């Protein structure tokens, strides 16, 4: 069965813990190995044949200029959370949708596992999350 998957990347936040790197750009635009975090994600999606990609922006939305991507804006990003950002893209929340945070990197093989899931709802987690969380 071929699925028509969509991706929504939540990228509205500034990333206060990453200052000064995020003084003038959102955290999804911080570079790692010569590409922004969001570019790494978009490349992973495209490598898995997901081309219907939307980004919910907020802080310095003008600095996210990726072509062939649909944009939504959370005007209230400073006082809301990721759920509210997701609802900014509510009109496309039908069918099979993958939601990711704009400040993470995942490998293509992890995305492939998610795509192969037959479940109605699937979540990919890092079992070592607590170690990373405690470093915050």
Please give the residue ranges for each predicted region:
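Conserved core of the sugar-phosphate nucleotidyltransferase
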Residues: 67, 107-136
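The conserved acidic donor/metal-binding loop of glycosyltransferases
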Residues: 102-104
């Amino acid at each position: 069965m071929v699925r028509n998957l969509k991706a929504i990347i939540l990228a509205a936040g500034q990333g206060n813990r990453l200052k000064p790197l995020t003084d003038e750009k959102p955290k999804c635009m911080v570079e790692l190995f010569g590409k922004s975090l969001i570019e790494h994600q978009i490349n992973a999606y495209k490598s898995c044949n997901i081309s219907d990609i939307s980004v919910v922006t907020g802080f310095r939305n003008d600095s996210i200029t990726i072509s062939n991507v649909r944009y939504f804006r959370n005007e209230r990003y400073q006082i809301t959370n990721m759920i509210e950002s997701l609802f900014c893209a509510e009109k496309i929340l039908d069918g099979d949708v993958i939601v990711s945070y704009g400040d993470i990197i995942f490998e293509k093989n992890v995305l492939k596992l998610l795509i192969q899931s037959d479940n109605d709802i699937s979540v990919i987690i890092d079992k070592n999350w607590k170690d990373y969380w405690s470093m915050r």
